[in-house]
Amino acid sequence: MRLTADTFRSLYLEYGPRAQGFFMRMTGYDIELSRDLTQDLFMRLWSIKDRYDSQLPFNAWMFTVAYNMLRNEHRRQMTVMEYVSSVDKEEPVEVPERLEQEQRRSMIHAAVERLPEPQKVVFLLRYGEDLTINEIAKVCDIPEGTVKSRMFSALNAIREYCKLNEKY
């Protein structure tokens, strides 16, 4: 597929919200920064549209560029923050199940926050963006085996954190 202005506009409408969601999770839910990064991402994609390999799904290419943008920002001292939004402390709890669900969510959020960046990125791309192992490998430019081992380590670390911090 050749990326014309019309096809690119359609791709922006389809994938722009996913890109912004990815940036939201990776920047601690900073809406303005996420919007700016999404705009920068699509400007970058347009400027390098001739490099797009139509054999790959567009979202894999898009997340590759997005991941590299974040990596470059990180090198400039920007830290990757939240995956799951914080629980609003002032929000009343309606039922015990909701409280339990929010506590689990908060615990997982804390566990994800403590992951080393390589594990966190793999985890977020898999569970936040629903990319396959193969797509994550392409996005991060690492072998599939490395993706699997990072995912295994991330899941074990999250599981261990939750076991240690579970309240009875």
Identify what each model region corresponds to.
Residues 134, 140-164:
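DNA-recognition helix of helix-turn-helix
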Residues 1-21, 35, 46:
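A short, charge-rich alpha-helical start-of-domain segment used by transcription regulators
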Residues 51-53, 64-84, 101, 153, ...:
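Arg/Lys-rich amphipathic alpha helix in sigma70-family domain 2
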Residues 16, 39-46, 56-79:
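Σ70-family region 2.3-2.4 aromatic/basic alpha-helix that recognizes the −10 promoter
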Residues 72, 80-105, 132:
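Internal acidic/polar
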Residues 16, 20, 42, 116, ...:
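C-terminal flanking helix
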Residues 19, 23, 34-45, 65, ...:
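Short, small-hydrophobic-rich alpha-helical interface motif
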Residues 122-126:
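A short pre-motif secondary-structure segment
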